[in-house]
Structures are given as structure tokens and as C-alpha cells.
Amino acid sequence: MRSVNFDPDAWEDFLFWLAADRKTARRITRLIGEIQRDPFSGIGKPEPLQGELSGYWSRRIDDEHRLVYRAGDDEVTMLKARYHY
């Protein structure tokens, strides 16, 4: 299973959700678990990003917010967990 690292902004986003909306924080935790197992398929409609964020992927947290991450063989780095790209 891949290890998970948070960019400082992504960690702040996650802490925001823990304080503001526990249901969304649980959804993010579930998405991260899925990403650890299979970063390119599963819940949240994973899609590769283009342009500046080429090489990153996103999954839907809800209609407004996305979880943006980059997956390697041994680790996953979370870039954002709030707003749209």
C-alpha cells in the first residue's frame, strides 16, 4: 500500500474539513484509502489533469470540491482537498 503525504495546503484543507464538516472529512478519508489501493480507478470519478497540473489526478469530493493528488509506485502526495482545481 502506498504511503500518503500532504502538501501543506492540502493538510490545511483537510484540517478545515475536520473542523467545518465531519461528513466531508470522512469522504476525503475514504477517497484517500481508495487512492492508496488504486490511484487511477474507483470512487470519486478519478480523472487525469492537464495543463499546469499535468501528472496529477483529481477525484470528486462533492459537486464543488476536488481532491487533487499525484501517485507514484510507493507514495501518494495530496495537493489540494478544497475547491476546484
Curated annotation (Swiss-Prot):
EC category name: hydrolase
Induction / repression: Expressed in log phase cells. Induced by treatment with rifampicin and gentamicin as well as by nitrosative and oxidative stress. Expressed in human macrophages 110 hours after infection. Induced in the lungs of mice infected for 4 weeks. A member of the relJK operon.
Gene Ontology BP term (one): negative regulation of DNA-templated transcription
Deleted gene: phenotype: No visible phenotype in culture or upon infection of mice. Significantly fewer persister cells are generated following exposure to gentamicin, levofloxacin and isoniazid.
Active-site residues, as the UniProt record annotates them: E47 (proton acceptor), H84 (proton donor)
InterPro entries in the record: RelE/ParE_toxin_dom_sf, YoeB_toxin
Pfam families: YoeB_toxin
Alphabetical UniProt keywords: DNA-binding, Endonuclease, Hydrolase, Nuclease, Repressor, Toxin-antitoxin system, Transcription, Transcription regulation
EC number of this enzyme: 3.1.-.-
MF (Gene Ontology): DNA binding; endonuclease activity
Family: Belongs to the YoeB family.
General function of this protein: Toxic component of a type II toxin-antitoxin (TA) system. Has RNase activity and preferentially cleaves at the 3'-end of purine ribonucleotides. Overexpression in M.tuberculosis or M.smegmatis inhibits colony formation in a bacteriostatic rather than bacteriocidal fashion. Its toxic effect is neutralized by coexpression with antitoxin RelJ (shown only for M.smegmatis). Overexpression also increases the number of rifampcin-tolerant persister cells. In combination with RelJ represses its own promoter. Several DNA-protein complexes are formed in vitro depending on the RelJ:RelK ratio.
Quaternary structure and interacting proteins, as annotated: Forms a toxin-antitoxin complex with RelJ, perhaps RelJ(2)-RelK, in which the toxin is probably inactive. Also interacts with antitoxins RelB and RelF in vitro, in M.smegmatis coexpression with non-cognate antitoxin RelB increases the toxicity of RelK while little change is seen in the RelFK pair.
UniProt protein name: Toxin RelK
Gene it is expressed from: relK
